């Protein structure tokens, strides 16, 4: 079989530029085979010194998903305080853990592994959102997580119930919802962050 590398590269790039953080989901379960695929993508991410200090809990049980939902702070920039309606909640979660909080590479590993999860989810048309405003003590308690593991973050997952749009960033990094409940996300322009051959002040 002839593999078109150009098409593969474009597919990867298109997946990257189409991915947005999703906070409203469809009430449709994700198959366990797909959830395992996401973890396998994380497993194969680069790891500082190849120490591989991350572990993951996959949660799709409805009762446990409800418990996790109650520990999460959602969309901090949106006022008044907002959270998804019951029918818009994530149908699965991934809890990201490290077994070595003192490892100097651990945060870099988390970034690499979680991006693999998000992009693989996007390729399956599954929305995702990394959440760090969480009640770690409560999550530890009802998921029976050992004290030797640090809970870094939670990734919410579900089939997309919204499609946020990108806006050119002007005066603020804060995202907002319009009157049609569409989420608008400011991003810095390419020309504002790229420097060719040397650093440019303008």
Q: Which residues does each predicted region cover?
A:
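Acidic, surface-exposed loops and disordered segments
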Residues: 1-202
């Amino acid at each position: 079989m002839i593999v078109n590398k150009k098409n593969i590269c474009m597919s990867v790039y298109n997946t990257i530029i189409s991915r947005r953080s999703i906070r409203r989901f469809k009430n449709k379960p994700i198959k366990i085979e797909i959830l395992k695929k996401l973890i396998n993508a994380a497993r194969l991410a680069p790891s500082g010194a190849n120490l591989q200090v991350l572990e993951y809990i996959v949660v799709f049980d409805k009762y446990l998903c409800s418990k996790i939902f109650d520990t999460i702070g959602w969309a901090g920039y949106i006022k008044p305080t907002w959270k998804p309606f019951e029918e818009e909640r994530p149908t699965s979660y991934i809890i990201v853990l490290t077994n070595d909080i003192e490892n100097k590479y651990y945060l870099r590993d988390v970034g690499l592994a979680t991006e693999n999860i998000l992009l693989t989810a996007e390729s399956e048309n599954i929305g995702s959102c990394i959440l760090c405003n969480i009640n770690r003590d409560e999550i530890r308690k009802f998921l029976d997580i050992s004290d030797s593991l640090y809970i870094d973050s939670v990734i919410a997952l579900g089939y997309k119930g919204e499609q946020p749009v990108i806006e050119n960033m002007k005066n603020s990094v804060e995202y907002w919802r319009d009157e049609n409940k569409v989420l608008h996300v400011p991003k810095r322009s390419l020309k504002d962050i790229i420097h060719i051959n040397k650093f440019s002040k303008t």
